[in-house]
Regions:
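Transmembrane beta-barrel architecture of outer-membrane proteins
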Residues: 3-6, 16-20, 42-48, 139-144, ...
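Membrane-embedded beta-strands that build the outer-membrane beta-barrel scaffold
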Residues: 20-28, 36-44, 144-150, 155-163, ...
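Extracytoplasmic gating/loop element in the C-terminal half of outer-membrane beta-barrel translocons
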Residues: 164-256
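Flexible, solvent-exposed coil segments and beta strand-coil junctions
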Residues: 1-6, 63, 122-129, 206-219, ...
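Conserved small-residue
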Residues: 10-16, 20, 27-136, 256, ...
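Flexible, surface-exposed loop regions and adjacent strand-edge segments
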Residues: 1-4, 53-63, 174-183, 265
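Surface-exposed coil/turn segments at beta-strand junctions on protein surfaces, enriched
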Residues: 15, 29-31, 150, 228, ...
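Flexible loop/turn segments at secondary-structure boundaries
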Residues: 45-49, 158, 165-169, 259-262
């Protein structure tokens, strides 16, 4: 049979998932006017890619985030791929000590002071795509949830907590901070920029009046996505059958997303 098309899409590759989920409930107090109970769950899951004929990448996130999510046999979906940063060039001696700039002109070497130093992973004396490595995993080690219910007579208070642990997040918002003249700079990035006086504590490269600079997709943009959240608070009062033809009357209120504790910016 012939379709007339020059190419044909086909499915290949597979993903294996293995996991475990545990649930439990504890009745901590059970009195006439007072009850207190907890129920929770925790889930573990691991996935693994297989059956690919070569490495490939998930769709580009946006113009400045290409080839961030690596798909490779033996790795999980959501693996982050990029360069590894190795501090900053603090002085001309550090620039010259790097084989990449050992023969650079004086002007080029001076321009590199205060710039990000990337790890030459394969030690070939230059920074290329071959120096990229796995820099994160968006899959959590585990996710969990906890309900706590406290009742006093007709009044019931319910709390629901949830969270994850061990998952990384690629913070694409940070890729817009180029420390150059083409875009805005956040106050935090500006205050923590490289300067000769702040070299030891710098988190961002020096500012420049140039339109652009070479800032590679690196572990700079990977953050710990673990979080602990009080998702909901429910308060309920049961009036019982205080009105004829109404067997039960309750009034309740709910607050959502009360607070979140996380290191993600």
């Amino acid at each position: 049979n012939s379709t007339g098309y020059t190419t044909m899409w086909t499915n290949f590759g597979h993903v294996k998932n293995k996991g475990l989920e545990l649930t439990g409930k504890i009745i901590a107090l059970d009195k006439k006017d007072w009850t207190l109970d907890f129920d929770g769950n925790i889930s573990f899951n691991k996935n693994e890619i297989g059956g690919l004929t070569a490495d490939q990448y998930a769709n580009q996130l946006w113009y400045s985030a290409k080839e961030v999510f690596l798909q490779r046999n033996g790795l999980p979906i959501g693996t982050l791929f990029g360069y590894i940063e190795d501090g900053f060039y603090d002085n001309i001696a550090e620039v010259r000590a790097d084989p990449i700039y050992a023969k650079a002109s004086d002007d080029e070497a001076r321009r590199m002071i205060g710039e990000i130093k990337y790890l030459d992973k394969n030690n070939d004396g230059k920074i290329t795509s071959e120096d990229r490595a796995i820099i994160g995993d968006t899959n959590p080690d585990f996710i969990y949830g906890l309900n706590a219910n406290l009742r006093w007579k007709n009044l019931t208070l319910g709390l629901f907590f949830q969270g994850t642990h061990g998952n990384d997040i690629f913070n694409g918002n940070l890729t817009n901070i180029g420390m150059s003249s083409i875009a805005n700079i956040t106050q935090d990035a500006y205050d923590s920029r490289w300067t000769p006086e702040n070299a030891a504590n710098a988190k961002w490269p020096r500012v420049t009046t140039a339109m652009t600079r070479d800032m590679k997709l690196s572990d700079r943009y990977v953050e710990d996505g673990s979080y602990f959240r009080l998702k909901t608070i429910n308060l309920n009062y049961n009036f019982g059958s205080v009105i004829k033809r109404i067997s039960n009357l309750s009034v309740f209120g709910t607050v959502t997303n009360v607070f979140t504790i996380t290191g993600y910016s």
